[in-house]
UniProtKB/Swiss-Prot annotation:
Annotated function: One of the early assembly proteins it binds 23S rRNA. One of the proteins that surrounds the polypeptide exit tunnel on the outside of the ribosome. Forms the main docking site for trigger factor binding to the ribosome.
UniProt keyword annotations, A-Z: Ribonucleoprotein, Ribosomal protein, RNA-binding, rRNA-binding
Residue stretches spanning the membrane: none
Annotated GO biological process: translation
Name of the protein in its database record: Large ribosomal subunit protein uL23
Subunit structure: Part of the 50S ribosomal subunit. Contacts protein L29, and trigger factor when it is bound to the ribosome.
Gene: rplW
Family recorded in the similarity comment: Belongs to the universal ribosomal protein uL23 family.
């Protein structure tokens, strides 16, 4: 699997910004079939940083309603990537 297929997009929210500042953790939406080793290798190769830990969460899609019709958003996977001391990724800086 290509590294650009594994990492879909960074998650930039208030919570993830605080985690980045306090714990040096960055968050990504990743491919549902990707494992922790593939995620670690993709982040290290793409951003040229050293990763110490990867935690993943499978997020269930929500039920949404439009009028009287129901639909379901897709399930997705979130990855919390902890970087080693001295490493950082600057694309979160606004």
């Amino acid at each position: 699997m290509n590294i650009y297929d594994i990492l879909k997009k960074p998650l930039v929210t208030e919570k993830t910004t605080l985690e980045k500042d306090a714990k040096n953790v960055i968050s990504f939406e990743v491919d549902r079939s990707a494992n922790k080793i593939e995620i670690k290798n993709a982040v290290e190769k793409l951003f040229k940083v050293e990763v110490s830990e990867v935690n993943t969460v499978n997020v269930a899609g929500k039920l949404k309603r439009v009028g009287r019709h129901y639909g379901k958003r897709s399930n997705w996977k979130k990855a919390y990537v902890t970087l080693k001391e001295g490493n950082n990724v600057d694309f979160f800086e606004i």
